[in-house]
Amino acid sequence: MQEKAVVLDDQMIRRALTRISHEIVERNKGVDNCVLVGIKTRGIFIAQRLAERIGQIEGKEIEVGELDITLYRDDLTLQSKNKEPLVKGSDIPVDITKKKVILVDDVLYTGRTVRAAMDALMDLGRPSQIQLAVLVDRGHRELPIRADYVGKNIPTSSEERIEVDLQETDQQDRVSIYDK
């Protein structure tokens, strides 16, 4: 797998997340009825960073939850020795019923992850609204799903891969394009 280009460095990621945070506050007229829910794994860390910035902007905390969509995927891959799916569990600290839930993920591609996340959310409650925030939108949708907040649109070919590295998991912040 050959790296073609670094499309976002640490400063660009920081700026994109700051902009998304402002957009979330502006669109929702504050964050009183909002919950950020990160899709495991990198979506959680992005959601936590957004919550930190929103806290700085608004002077109040926004709840952050973690969503494991393993059992909701239509392309479930079995990753354990006994052929059972590896489930890490969801952790959403508040009832999402009648809340504005902002789903957070690192990359929006086919839309299948987001569809699975919406199914998982509906099993946990009935939000008044679901919004989507992603660091990168790379196109190639297979489902009618569109992000409300996008850090950067990066058009790619189907022969390319986007790799998101975050400090929390990869000891650096950057987004790169690779040839498959």
Curated annotation (Swiss-Prot):
<keyword id="KW-0694">RNA-binding</keyword>
<feature type="short sequence motif" description="PRPP-binding">
    <location>
        <begin position="101"/>
        <end position="113"/>
    </location>
</feature>
<comment type="function">
    <text>Regulates transcriptional attenuation of the pyrimidine nucleotide (pyr) operon by binding in a uridine-dependent manner to specific sites on pyr mRNA. This disrupts an antiterminator hairpin in the RNA and favors formation of a downstream transcription terminator, leading to a reduced expression of downstream genes.</text>
</comment>
<dbReference type="GO" id="GO:0004845">
    <property type="term" value="F:uracil phosphoribosyltransferase activity"/>
</dbReference>
<keyword id="KW-0808">Transferase</keyword>
<comment type="function">
    <text>Also displays a weak uracil phosphoribosyltransferase activity which is not physiologically significant.</text>
</comment>
<keyword id="KW-0805">Transcription regulation</keyword>
<dbReference type="GO" id="GO:0003723">
    <property type="term" value="F:RNA binding"/>
</dbReference>
<dbReference type="InterPro" id="IPR023050">
    <property type="entry name" value="PyrR"/>
</dbReference>
<keyword id="KW-0804">Transcription</keyword>
<dbReference type="GO" id="GO:0006353">
    <property type="term" value="P:DNA-templated transcription termination"/>
</dbReference>
<keyword id="KW-0806">Transcription termination</keyword>
<dbReference type="Pfam" id="PF00156">
    <property type="entry name" value="Pribosyltran"/>
</dbReference>
<protein>
    <recommendedName>
        <fullName>Bifunctional protein PyrR</fullName>
        <ecNumber>2.4.2.9</ecNumber>
    </recommendedName>
</protein>
<dbReference type="InterPro" id="IPR029057">
    <property type="entry name" value="PRTase-like"/>
</dbReference>
<dbReference type="InterPro" id="IPR000836">
    <property type="entry name" value="PRibTrfase_dom"/>
</dbReference>
<comment type="similarity">
    <text>Belongs to the purine/pyrimidine phosphoribosyltransferase family. PyrR subfamily.</text>
</comment>
<comment type="subunit">
    <text>Homodimer and homohexamer; in equilibrium.</text>
</comment>
<keyword id="KW-0328">Glycosyltransferase</keyword>
<dbReference type="InterPro" id="IPR050137">
    <property type="entry name" value="PyrR_bifunctional"/>
</dbReference>
